[in-house]
From Swiss-Prot:
It comes from Bacillus subtilis (strain 168). Residues 10-122 form the HotDog ACOT-type domain. This is Uncharacterized acyl-CoA thioester hydrolase YkhA. GO terms for biological process: acyl-CoA metabolic process; fatty acid catabolic process. InterPro entries: Cytosol_ACT, HOTDOG_ACOT, HotDog_dom_sf, Thioestr_dom.
Length: 172
C-alpha cells in the first residue's frame, strides 16, 4: 500500500452561509437542531471529499455542541476542515457562527466533530493523505485529536455492546 501524500487543513476548508427562514425554525423561533445537524453533515462531507478526493461515508457524528440559539434574524455561517486523519478515516471540525443581520454581531453558535471514511471504487476503506495544520486553531485541534479518537473508539465499543443487548422485535 502506497503512503498517501500530505495536504494542509486549509485545502479541505469549506464555508457555507445560509439565512434562517421561518420554515427552518421551531416553536421557540430558533433554528431546528436537526436542520443545523443536516447543514453540518453536508459541509463536513465536502471537506472530507476535498481532502482525500474520493467517495466518503459519515462514520460518526462524534459531537454537536449547541452553544447559542440561532434566530430568524440571524444568518448561520458554517466553516469546516479536516483536522486529523487515521489510516482511512478523517476527523472533520465544523464551527458554526451566527450573525445578527440587523446589528452585525457574530457569536459562536455551535461546534461539531465528525468522522468520515474514504472508500475505493469497491466501497472498501482506502488510505487518506496526511494532514498538516498551520493556524493556531488548526494546530490546537490537531494536537487534541488523538484524545478525541480514543474517546470515539471507547464510545464505539460501548455502542456495540449496547447494540448486542438490544432486541429487534416489533414494539407493537
Amino acid at each position: 500500500m502506497e503512503t498517501p501524500e500530505t495536504r494542509f487543513c486549509k485545502e479541505s476548508k469549506v464555508v457555507k452561509t445560509s439565512r434562517v427562514f421561518p420554515l427552518d425554525t421551531n416553536n421557540h423561533n430558533t433554528l431546528f437542531g436537526g436542520k443545523l445537524m443536516s447543514y453540518i453533515d453536508d459541509i463536513a462531507s465536502i471537506s472530507a471529499a476535498r481532502h482525500c478526493r474520493r467517495e466518503t461515508v459519515t462514520a460518526s457524528m462524534d459531537s454537536v455542541d449547541f452553544l447559542k440559539p440561532i434566530g430568524q434574524k440571524d444568518s448561520v455561517c458554517l466553516e469546516s476542515y479536516v483536522t486529523w486523519v487515521g489510516t482511512s478515516s478523517m476527523e472533520v471540525f465544523v464551527k458554526v457562527i451566527k450573525e445578527h443581520l440587523m446589528t452585525g454581531e457574530r457569536e459562536l453558535a455551535a461546534t461539531s466533530f465528525l468522522t468520515f471514511v474514504a472508500l475505493d471504487s469497491n466501497g472498501k476503506p482506502v488510505p487518506v493523505p496526511r494532514v498538516v495544520p498551520e493556524t493556531e486553531e488548526e494546530i490546537m485541534l490537531h494536537n487534541t485529536a488523538v484524545q478525541r479518537a480514543n474517546e470515539r473508539k471507547n464510545r464505539k465499543r460501548h455502542s456495540q455492546a449496547l447494540a448486542n443487548a438490544l432486541g429487534t422485535d416489533k414494539p407493537w
